[in-house]
Amino acid sequence: MSKTYQATGIILKGMPLGEADRLVTILTSEYGLIQAVVPGARKHKSRLRGRSELFVVNQLLIVKGRSLDKLIQAETLESYPGLSRDLGKLTASQYLAELVLSLALCEQPQIELYELLNEHLRRIEQKATPQTLYPHLAQAVFHLLAIAGVAPQVYQCCLSREPIETNFIDSLWRVGFSFESGGAINLSSDRRQPFQPSDDLKKEIFLNKLNWKLTAVELTLLQQLGQKFLPQAYDIFPMDVAISSIDVAWIKIERILREYAQYHFGRSFRSATLVDTLAPVDF
């Protein structure tokens, strides 16, 4: 990397530095995560003031420094003004930014991650409504987990490797979900080998590994998240499934994926806790 270099990146984090500067963390497609000082960015008349704000995409000119790089020029390519005008959208986007910061690499190209984040920010800004914010957020998190190589298994039992068939007829039907095992667990199949404890002990060990239990509606929604776009509810559910149950299911799925991500990345996401205030529901 030369003393001066160019990159295309999105601002994911910023904080005051000194009297008038700003320290920003940027996800670039060419070099992954970089930190840079933006001189004078907090001055009212600075040309870099607005361009160093959260979720602004810029073509950047950066000077390589001994400890910190210095951003000296930025030409805005895209921004997401709609995010800051809606508390729900802003909260969801800040959560995604934290998640990306935990999985992005430094000094390595991150083209796929960069493009995926921008795509989901676009969807949240332009398409998400109060009713569809949770589905958009859940799919974004699932796609990010997939890039990191830790997306949960939702089609097969993590223990038996057998396909899981949802049961909409039996209202008591449930499937387990285990962070440690990596996804769904068929509650009627516990075939771990070679260890064969007594039935009582086996049941205790098995249940302790379950973090959640999912209904047929919840598992079906979870299975749609790997697709590029989410299908309409009437395409995947029987006619007698209530829309209200689907809305609540999305809230639960977001919570499950958040806890799953925290387990696998070994950290909590501060912005994610604010998501709970958007639709307070106890599970």
From Swiss-Prot:
Q: Extract one GO cellular component term from the record.
A: bacterial nucleoid
Could you tell me the Gene Ontology terms of the biological process aspect for this record? DNA recombination; double-strand break repair
Q: Which HAMAP family match?
A: RecO (MF_00201)
PANTHER family cross-referenced by the UniProt entry: DNA REPAIR PROTEIN RECO
Gene that this polypeptide is encoded by: recO
Q: Tell me the function of this protein.
A: Involved in DNA repair and RecF pathway recombination.
The record's keywords, sorted A to Z, are: DNA damage, DNA recombination, DNA repair
Keyword DNA repair appears in the UniProt entry: yes
> DNA damage: present as a keyword of the record?
yes
Protein name in the entry: DNA repair protein RecO
* Taxonomic lineage of the native organism: Bacteria, Bacillati, Cyanobacteriota, Cyanophyceae, Oscillatoriophycideae
Protein family (similarity comment): Belongs to the RecO family.
Q: Which InterPro entries match?
A: ARFGAP/RecO, DNA_rep/recomb_RecO_N, NA-bd_OB-fold, RecO, RecO_C
